[in-house]
Regions:
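Conserved Rossmann-fold NAD(P)-dependent oxidoreductase catalytic core, especially the SDR/UDP-sugar
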Residues: 97-98, 106-153
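Substrate-positioning beta->alpha
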Residues: 155-162, 189-196, 209-230, 237
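Amphipathic terminal alpha-helices
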Residues: 307-320
Length: 320
């Protein structure tokens, strides 16, 4: 769905001040879209309004309020970016994740239902490659999803998949696009110049677990935003959005430590670390599969500008 530059196409963005939403809003504006952003914070609303974006202060948990907004705004496209995972926590804290779980489940159900009622022509939602189970084979969009993890990690995966189901089933099943994004890096993320990853590596508190065989598929936030934008015109489907250079944790963790001129990261046997302490971190570092972006390249015509995390990380942490 393209704009002629006359503002004839309108878009509503959730998470418009987030790590993907922020560059997406800038991209939409540069392409002539009329942009409305749903934000929870009044201060963000004032900043957005000053940049030519219509800001609506509200909460996705307020289902009726979101419905009124959609009916009033009647956007052509809904970009649901409030669901993006901008961090890789060492453990999932149920209390801290409660808002995210609410957005993925109740918030998505409400806004998708309202979007359909308002006649939205395309819904694009950001999910995560976290939904893929351990495998030695590269995960494609046809790979069965779900993990056997219990506790909060399992709740997160189930919530993401439930969110995906709402989007994929929207309308007659032909208006929803789900983007399973890789581990985000860049401004505002865990992997940023002043992000938590750098602190942990400098303190030698980001270990390699076991043999470090978990495969990371990274994605720069600007490439993610470009993919979300492209999804506005892509065939309704699920797409993996990752760079072209999947890498084992045994390789990327020391690489970043070297960029930071930090001491070599510790390497812990799994029996010492105790995977039950953090099923997510254990999965990411030891069992996560590589992910293929072939479908997105072919059907969305999307190609990552930063094709390798190596170049992207070197931009963030240039050697001095």
């Amino acid at each position: 769905m393209s704009s002629s530059g006359t503002g004839s196409v309108s878009a509503l963005v959730t998470g418009g001040t987030g790590v993907i939403g922020n560059p997406l809003v800038s991209l939409l504006r540069s392409r002539g879209y009329d942009v409305t952003v749903l934000t929870r914070r009044q201060a963000h609303g004032k900043v957005l309004s000053g940049s030519g974006v219509k800001a609506c202060v509200g909460d996705l948990a307020d289902v009726e309020g979101v419905r009124r907004l959609l009916i009033s705004a009647k956007p052509n496209v809904l970009f649901h970016c409030a669901t993006a995972l901008a961090w890789v926590p060492s453990r999932f804290c149920a209390r801290k994740l409660t808002p995210a779980l609410r957005i993925w489940k109740t918030g998505t159900e409400g806004i998708v239902s309202a979007a359909v009622e308002a006649g939205v022509q395309r819904i694009v939602a950001v999910s995560s490659i976290l939904v893929y189970p351990a495998s030695k084979e590269a995960a494609t969009e046809e790979t069965p999803c779900g993990v056997s993890a219990r506790g909060t990690f399992g709740r997160v995966v189930r919530a993401l998949l439930e969110m995906e189901d709402w989007v994929r089933g929207a309308g007659d099943g032909n208006i929803g696009v789900v983007l399973r994004c890789g581990w985000l890096y860049g401004e505002g993320t865990f992997f940023s110049a002043d992000g938590r990853c750098a602190d942990l590596l400098r303190q030698r508190r980001f270990p390699i677990l076991g043999k470090g065989e978990g495969i990371a598929s990274f994605l720069h936030v600007e490439d993610a935003a470009r993919a979300v934008f492209a999804a506005g015109e892509a065939p309704a489907d699920v797409y993996n959005i990752v760079d072209d250079d999947p890498v084992a944790s045994a390789e990327w963790v020391p690489f970043v430590a070297d960029l930071l001129r930090a001491d070599s990261p510790r390497q812990h046997p799994l029996w010492v670390y105790k995977p039950t302490r953090s099923p997510l971190f254990s999965h990411v570092m030891t069992r996560q599969p590589s992910v293929s972006n072939e479908l997105a390249r072919r059907r969305m015509k999307w190609v990552p500008v930063r094709s390798s995390w190596r170049d992207g990380f070197a931009e963030i942490w240039p050697k001095k």
